[in-house]
Amino acid sequence: MFVKILPPEVRRKIAAGEVIDAPVDVVKELIENSLDAKATRIEIEVVKGGKRLIRVKDNGIGIHPEDIEKVVLSGATSKIEKETDLLNVETYGFRGEALYSISSVSKFRLRSRFYQEKEGREIEVEGGTLKSVRRVGMEVGTEVEVYDLFFNLPARKKFLRKEDTERRKITELVKEYAITNPQVDFHLFSEGKETLNLKKKDLKGRIEEIFESIFEEESSEREGIKVRAFISRNQKRGKYYLFVNSRPVYNKNLKEYLKKTFGYKTIVVLFIDIPPFLVDFNVHPKKKEVKFLKERKIYELIRELSSRKHTILEIPTLNQKTESYKPTYEVIGQLNETFILVSDGNFLYFIDQHLLDERINYEKNGNEELACRISVKAGEKLTNEKIKELIKEWKKLENPHVCPHGRPIYYKLPLKEVYEKLGRSF
């Protein structure tokens, strides 16, 4: 058999298949383009799980009119110019293959207005063939519409999952990018209904909103590598999310290490900030997998974090007198006959007295209704002895974080923030 050179249209479809093999891949590439364009609001709309339509609209800086036709060409990128630039990639996109791949396997429309221009440009591409270019009136930003994904690749289209499955994958992906970009509003619409509405927040607030759980934060840094973990324990099942330089990534060994280190019933959201030249995102066409140059150092930092995972609050024996308590620890008292205030020297804890007592009683008798009925109530004045008794029992709880109904037992306020707000050093 003789070697043959494949026609351009065949090579184009093969290359596109390496980057795009499902609707979620399209959404990923378009969200990354929006984030690289400094968008602060991103709208994603899907119809039939993205098989019929994917639309992503942002308020980023837009695409310059001179570049509007270039963006659908293979290798068209503004992120890198030479091979050595791959060692210092700080953007999501850098290969210049995303829009080329998407437009090769769909009916594609892109409209964009550059922030220095008074009008926008629109291009239409079908199966890799440019159909039209025209001027359009629009706001600054970019909007991409992808119709009939894989219309020209029936074999690939046949292997797409059910609409609900594709929809769930897209929802999970949007949540991942929302986690690592809390400064951006994310809105997801499916079949005309808004299914996600995530307003900009601080990072911890965004994570707690998405997972509807209380998280503790730990961080460690060494030799220019910083590891930051948000941890929520005692879940029904564990979930483990890894972000490297703000990019959602997958690393099988690291995920297994997180499971073994933090436990199989813990949600762990791990951020690794590492110099670009110490990490390789160019392992796979989808940039989902990564390799580290100093992987052992990352494991050491994670192990250091895990050693603190049970030190949320170290409470001394409360039958001692106050004077003999550790100097960094203090039971302050009761607030509004509803909360018990406790400080460990670094944080001030507002503990809901009813929820705490309810958790204590539930772990003793296993009956939610009975535990609620016999527990102290909000609005009930507690003696110092009762407060000490509750705190002592709190230390022994199997799950000291949430009540039997899943509500958080306490809120933790960093004293450092209080000092900073009042212009004092901590």
UniProtKB/Swiss-Prot annotation:
UniProt GO cellular component terms: mismatch repair complex
Keyword Zinc-finger: no
Record key words, sorted: DNA damage, DNA repair
GO BP: mismatch repair
Domain of life, source organism: Bacteria
GO molecular function: ATP binding; ATP hydrolysis activity; ATP-dependent DNA damage sensor activity; mismatched DNA binding
CDD domains in alphabetical order: HATPase_MutL-MLH-PMS-like (cd16926), MutL_Trans (cd00782)
Keyword DNA damage: yes
Cited Pfam families: DNA_mis_repair (PF01119), HATPase_c_3 (PF13589), MutL_C (PF08676)
Family: Belongs to the DNA mismatch repair MutL/HexB family.
Matching PANTHER family: DNA MISMATCH REPAIR PROTEIN MLH, PMS, MUTL, DNA MISMATCH REPAIR PROTEIN MLH1
Functional note: This protein is involved in the repair of mismatches in DNA. It is required for dam-dependent methyl-directed DNA mismatch repair. May act as a 'molecular matchmaker', a protein that promotes the formation of a stable complex between two or more DNA-binding proteins in an ATP-dependent manner without itself being part of a final effector complex.
Protein name from the UniProt record: DNA mismatch repair protein MutL
Source organism of the structure: Aquifex pyrophilus
Gene name of the encoded protein: mutL
